[in-house]
Every structure is written in structure tokens, then in C-alpha cells.
Swiss-Prot record:
Protein name: Uncharacterized protein 101L
Domain of life: Viruses
InterPro entries reported in the protein's UniProt record: WGR_domain
Organism the protein comes from: Invertebrate iridescent virus 6 (IIV-6)
Amino acid sequence: MELYCKLIMVTQNNNNKYYEMKYEGGDTFTVIYGRVDQSSTVISKPFKEWDKIKNSKLKKGYKDVSSKSVSSVESNEREIENKSIKEFIHKMRAYTNLLVSNTYSVNSKEVSSSQISNAQKLLNKISSMDMDENVDEINELLILLYTCIPRKIKNVKKCILPYIDIKQTIIQEQDNLDALSSQLKKNVSQNNKINNILNVHFSKFLEEASSSFNIDVCKLKSILNEDKTFLEMI
């Protein structure tokens, strides 16, 4: 029997802590804890204390972000005749990989579609709120967003109001979610996947790509619609 539990705590007081528990058999389990993206400590604990320790952390404000491993989309790449399209596909894939690695402390294999969905709901709610009249509520939602999927944050205070441009943050957070979503294997229609990859939140990148590679974005979208196998390459 194997058990795994990952707990994190993100607060406005600059806490971005994690507590990871791994059991692979025997009388003890391994604990790895520390601050996200910083040094960690590894210790062993008696297995009989698993539930006690986990419940103790939850009472202190930690959130359970454990998820079943999610396989990323398997590559089914084939040779692309159009050099501009080929370069665009590779650039887009590199762009999404960079966003994910720079933002999150986990990879797509450690994130579930439900986590993505919950994060999207939080972001949508933040986007719909009055930015001037709901500062405290927006900050609470931002903390929940940062907790939903473990991420790299050195100073939590600098990632909430009044230290951020909330409109720019919303755009960036959507970029982050779109990039992570594109790496997950999900049961969505191809058209939805196309729109997810080529949506307005990648507008800045698409404008640069269109200029650099001489690609008409509308034409590219049409090509993707006609040839679904290109989607497996992003």
C-alpha cells in the first residue's frame, strides 16, 4: 500500500509553506516540508501518526492539494511541411512550458482537471468584482487561487492588493491556467481545445508570432480545425 498527501498553506502574512507526506510501506513514512521554492527538510515519522499529523496540519490552516496523477498528452508528433507553422508550434509549446515552470511548483502530471476548474472559477469570480470596493474579498480569493495549485511565491504580500495591478494579474493568471491546461489530457472537444490554445489571453504572444513567422492567426486556426493532429504537438 502506498499513500501520498500534499498540504500547503498560503496566507497574506507571507506564508507559502508545504507539508508533503509519503508512505511506501513499513512502519514509517517520509515527511518533506518547508517553503515553496526554497530549502526543504526531510524527516521520518511513525506510520501510526499519519492521520494525527495530517489532521493537525489541517487545523492549522493547511489545505490538502493532493491529487491523482494526471498523464500529460502523449506526443504524436509528425513532420510538418509548413516551416512557419512548425516553428510556431514549437515556439507555442516552449512558451506554455516556460509559463508553467516559472509559475507553479508542480508539473502537469501532479495537477488534476478539478484543480484547474476550481482555479478558473476563482479567477472568473475575481474578474467580475469591483476592484475598488472589494479589496479584502479579492485578496481572500487571490489567496485561495494561489493555494489551489501549488506555486512559486517568494513574498505573498507582493502578490495581493495593493501591491499588484489586478487587471494585469488577472490576464497573467489566465495565461498561467491556459498554459497548464494545454498540458493536461482532458476530454474536451477539439474546437474547445483550439480556442483554449489560441484565445485572447495569448494575444501578445500571437501578435509577436504573427510578425516573426509571417503567420495569419485566423489562417492558423483554420488549419488547426482542418488538421486536428497539430493539437497533439502543443
